[in-house]
Each structure stands twice: as structure tokens, then as C-alpha cells.
Amino acid sequence: PAVPIAGKYRLVDIPISNCLNNGIGRMFVLTQFNSASLNRHIKNTYHFSAFSKAFVDILAAEQTPDSPGWFQGTADAVRQSLRHIEPFESDYILILSGDQLYQMDFANMLDNHKALGADISVATIPVAQREAPEFGILKSDEGLITSFIEKPKKEVLQDWVSDTGEEMKAAGRDYLASMGIYIFNRNLMF
């Protein structure tokens, strides 16, 4: 996430910019290893009016009596940080990866999440068989996730072909890869 891009920006600025452009103004950036330059960049870059409820705050890994170790991955980072997130009212929690380049309309994803009555939504991107072992791959049935496998071996991929639409199938993109973008209903987290 601290990787410089285009001179003065960092990779983490992409998901933060996506949030700000979607009207999402309350964000936590969870950091752990070798994060001093990233923490400094966030602190020096994102300033909001004193009258605004908007913020971009760093939640660095911390050792507590309940969690004496470092984060053991993204899910654990979120789990250990929930006590900092809980006081902020919201019906939904958007969880993003800080190291991807994309532009996304989160409002559209949230609308789909609500329309399906989902508890959790995962943004996916169709990928080709040669790319699939680099991602978490999921199967779905009418918009509902039925199975998930993290970085599958090529030998099992034939069982993970999904309906990705005619255009993607024609391009050889038969697998749904997780983009590391999730919406959770708040009541699942607390």
C-alpha cells in the first residue's frame, strides 16, 4: 500500500480516493509491518474540516491482553480492530485491500447487496485459467456464493468454472476471482 505511484501518490490512495468519490468519508487504514512511511503519508495527506465527520485514521497493529500477537492476515486485522470501529454507526461495513488499482462505484455494489438481501457481498472479476491460481476463486449460484477456494491448484480448476457471462466466456475468463472488496452487514460484525 505504501508503494509510490505517479510521483506524490501511494497505492493506498486509490481505494481511499474510490471511497471519497463514493461519498464514504469515514475510513480506517489498518497497518502492521514496516508502516511508518505509510502512516506518515496518511497523516499528512488527508485533512478534513473540523465541522466534518469525515476522517482517514490509521489503526496500527497493537498487542492487547485479548490479542497478544500481530495480525494474521486481513480477516484477523479486521477482527482485532473491531473495537475501534464499533462506536461509529453504519448499517454496512466496506472492507477494501489497500494495494490494488481500480475504479469502482461502491454505491452500485451496495445497491446490489441490499437488493439481494445479502449478509456479505464480495466483488469479483472474471479471470482466465492461467490467472486463477493467483486469486481466491469462488463459485456462485444466482448471485449467492456457494464455494470459495484460496489460490487453487491447476488440477482442481475444472470444478471452479462459473457463469461469467457470454462476453467473458468468449474471452476465456471462466473463473470468478475475489477482488478483496467486501460489504458486511454491521450486525454480523458486532
Predicted segments with their positions:
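Unchanged
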Residues: 1-190
